[in-house]
UniProtKB/Swiss-Prot annotation:
Disulphide bond pairs: none
Annotated gene: Snx24
Chain sites annotated for binding a 1,2-diacyl-sn-glycero-3-phospho-(1D-myo-inositol-3-phosphate): R38, S40, K61, R74
Phosphoserine: modified positions: S113, S116
Topology in membrane: Peripheral membrane protein
Species name: Rattus norvegicus (Rat)
Keywords, in A-Z order: Acetylation, Cytoplasmic vesicle, Lipid-binding, Membrane, Phosphoprotein, Protein transport, Transport
Protein name (record): Sorting nexin-24
Database matches in Gene3D superfamilies: Phox-like domain
Amino acid sequence: MEVYIPSFRHEDSDLERGYTVFKIEVLMNGRKHFVEKRYSEFHALHKKLKKCIKTPEIPSKHVRNWVPKVLEQRRQGLETYLQAVILENEELPKLFLDFLNVRHLPSLPKAESCGSFDETESEESSKLSHQPVLLFLGDPYVLPAASDFPNVVIEGVLHGIFFSHLQPR
């Protein structure tokens, strides 16, 4: 799993003063998705993670400082924090995966120490779904044959499909 925070933006709200939203890019198993979180959500995650695993330091919250340089330092610090949690823990807690909107892997022992799958999800929803994958290493019709003998079956089928208007050899 790879995690980056490529950007942030300022949100204005009628009910409260504005806040900053950090855009988190999550790359896992060849798939990429984005999650947006406020600093307060990072801080809440940190408090919960400290009870389950050894955590790195989280960047401090500056007193309503909207200076772009300070926000950029916080973005870098939060990115480093997420990457350190991943690097320092062989198995990631369920609440960390929830934070990143990553589908749970049912065989993570440390995940259960932070909350069991049975508490929040049914057995059906926590199962991994099967995603068939097709892999073509190369086109067998373009690559040279492994032996010097022609494959008469393949030649016959290809001739019949693509050259049916021609007479046989």
